[in-house]
């Protein structure tokens, strides 16, 4: 607020000096009124939100398809990191959090198509995707529907209090899928 008032005072002084042809006035920083509300610090950007999902190739090239799926999950993780950092912050950057939430929703909406037949462990290509994604598709789809619903709520949570209330259920729905449908790498 002080900066805005200072800039306005400086601009006015310069304009008056230019119009009057006299000596330029020296801008003076205004002093806050005694009863003025305390200045709330602006939120610090934790990190800019990464992008949303990349386009998937045709599933005829299984290795390329699985690589693109993995890259999408890596990018989803980066968006979740932005959300987690803002969740932990006393002054979350709601612009970055909202952008990341929009991306998470885009991932959740696209994710159901990332698991066509032949792109799982039976492909012979290393994957963190467990076979139960394909053998128990109804449970996978239910978990995905939960993530989609929670991500819609997270996108709608545009103030800090609503965001901090909604991030845990959204993150929990991600964790549920990790626990149920993801095989941790051997080197982790």
Listing of model-derived features with the role each one plays in the protein:
Residues 15-18:
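C-terminal motif of bacterial Sec signal peptides marking the signal peptidase cleavage site
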Residues 26-60:
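Post-signal peptide N-terminal segment of mature Sec-exported envelope proteins
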Residues 12:
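Active-site-proximal loop/hinge segments that shape catalytic or ion-binding/gating pockets
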Residues 5, 23-35, 49, 66-94, ...:
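Sequence context surrounding c-type heme c attachment/ligation sites in exported
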Residues 1-8:
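Bacterial N-terminal signal peptides that target proteins for export
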């Amino acid at each position: 607020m002080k900066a805005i008032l200072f800039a306005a005072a400086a601009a006015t002084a310069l304009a008056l000096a230019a119009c009057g042809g006299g000596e330029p006035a020296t801008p003076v920083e205004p002093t806050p009124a005694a009863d003025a509300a305390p200045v709330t610090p602006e939120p610090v950007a934790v990190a800019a939100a990464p992008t949303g999902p990349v386009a998937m190739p045709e599933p005829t090239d299984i290795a390329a398809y699985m690589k693109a799926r993995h890259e999408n999950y890596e990018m989803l993780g980066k968006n979740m990191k932005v959300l987690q950092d803002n969740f932990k912050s006393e002054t979350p950057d709601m612009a970055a959090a909202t952008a990341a939430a929009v991306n998470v929703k885009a991932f959740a909406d696209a994710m159901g198509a990332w698991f066509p037949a032949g792109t799982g462990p039976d492909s012979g290509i290393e994957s963190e995707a467990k076979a139960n994604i394909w053998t128990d598709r109804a449970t996978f789809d239910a978990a995905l529907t939960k993530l989609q619903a929670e991500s819609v709520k997270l996108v709608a949570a545009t103030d800090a209090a609503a965001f901090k209330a909604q991030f845990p259920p959204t993150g929990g729905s991600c964790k549920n899928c990790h626990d149920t449908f993801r095989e941790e790498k051997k080197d982790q």
